[in-house]
């Protein structure tokens, strides 16, 4: 009896070799792109590094006509606005995610989840325009003025809420950033909370645990790595945001007060505002060094988050 011919020819060794080469090439391209970005940033910013050295990091003055540049104000604005954004966004996102996964009725879960995803899809320039023309005037009248009056007599804390209520400034930029990153963090938290085995939660409810106890003793310990990942995703988004912050932060190189009401600047805003108009080679180099600093900050945040997740996983495995 004649052997039947197979319907298709199985891939040979040659196909495996080609596929392996293509996959390795794709991975190599990623590394080459990363290395190319780092090298190009260092080369482009080298004149500024040579002239100002490490003093560039703590110099407040930024005087383009006289070729005097310092990164302290943009670094301060970037870090403070991102911290404010996380301070607001993390608890709000946590509450949204828990409501969607544990408390929301079935008919509400899907529409609310879609609404959160739509918020994440809104372009940042729309947030910036809304923040400048709608949010800032209301923020000045209904938050900055009354809170400033209440806090003005409190030592130390009062200094953070002193000064005129402009509506725009570091605090306003932080709030806008928080609104922008809430959908990202909430979506990630919701997804990781849904990964908690239903059997574990039902067992906890079966022995008399309340919803609060199930959340704190079952859901959070099981999903803490994913929660940290979501928070770091939001932080990365806040650090790199440009247009919305440019609209609302004030774009001034002043650091004469600790007040969060005062206008300031961020690294991304400085780059967006000045790069097209930079004329001298040193000015361009200083802006490129700002980009290098932002790259380093982002890398440190990512490395810290990875280290934290590894430590948590290691401690969990040791139990």
Predicted regions and their residues:
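Transmembrane alpha-helical segments of polytopic membrane transport and secretion proteins
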Residues: 1-27, 305-319
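Periplasmic/extracellular loop-to-transmembrane helix junction in inner-membrane transport proteins
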Residues: 5-17, 21-22, 42-85, 105-106, ...
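Membrane-interfacial helix termini and adjacent extracytoplasmic/periplasmic loops
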Residues: 51-69, 127-178, 261
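Transmembrane-helix boundary motif in ABC transporter permease subunits
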Residues: 85-116, 306-314
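Membrane-cytosol interface at the C-terminal ends of specific transmembrane alpha-helices
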Residues: 94-99, 155, 162-206, 210-213, ...
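Transmembrane alpha-helices
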Residues: 115-118, 122, 126, 185-196, ...
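C-terminal transmembrane helix and the adjacent membrane-cytosol boundary/short C-terminal tail
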Residues: 190-194, 198, 273-319
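Glycine-rich helix-loop "coupling/hinge" segments at transmembrane-helix boundaries
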Residues: 237-280
């Amino acid at each position: 009896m004649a052997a039947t011919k197979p319907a298709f020819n199985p891939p040979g060794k040659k196909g495996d070799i080609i596929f392996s080469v293509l996959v390795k090439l794709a991975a190599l391209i990623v590394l080459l792109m990363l290395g190319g970005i780092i090298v190009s940033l260092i080369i482009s910013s080298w004149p500024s590094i040579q002239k100002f050295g490490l003093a560039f990091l703590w110099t407040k003055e930024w005087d383009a006509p006289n070729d005097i540049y310092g990164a302290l104000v943009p670094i301060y604005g970037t870090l403070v606005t991102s911290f404010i954004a996380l301070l607001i966004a993390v608890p709000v996102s946590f509450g949204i995610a828990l409501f969607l996964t544990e408390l929301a009725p079935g008919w509400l879960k899907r529409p609310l989840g879609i609404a959160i995803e739509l918020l994440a899809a809104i372009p940042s320039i729309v947030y910036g325009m809304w923040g400048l023309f709608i949010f800032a005037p209301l923020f000045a009248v209904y938050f900055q003025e009354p809170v400033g009056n209440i806090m003005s007599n409190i030592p130390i804390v009062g200094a953070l809420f002193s000064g005129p209520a402009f509506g725009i400034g570091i605090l306003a930029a932080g709030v806008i950033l928080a609104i922008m990153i809430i959908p990202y963090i909430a979506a990630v938290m919701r997804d990781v909370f849904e990964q908690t085995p239903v059997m574990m939660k039902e067992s906890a409810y079966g022995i008399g645990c309340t919803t609060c106890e199930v959340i704190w003793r079952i859901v959070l310990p099981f999903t803490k790595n994913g929660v940290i990942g979501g928070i770091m995703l939001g932080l990365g988004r806040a650090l790199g945001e440009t247009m919305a912050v440019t609209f609302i932060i004030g774009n001034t190189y002043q650091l004469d007060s600790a007040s969060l009401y005062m206008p300031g600047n961020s690294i991304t805003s400085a780059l967006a505002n000045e790069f097209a108009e930079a004329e001298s080679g040193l000015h361009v180099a200083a802006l490129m060094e700002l980009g290098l600093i932002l790259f380093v900050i982002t890398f440190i945040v990512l490395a810290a988050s990875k280290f934290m997740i590894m430590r948590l996983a290691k401690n969990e495995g040791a139990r």
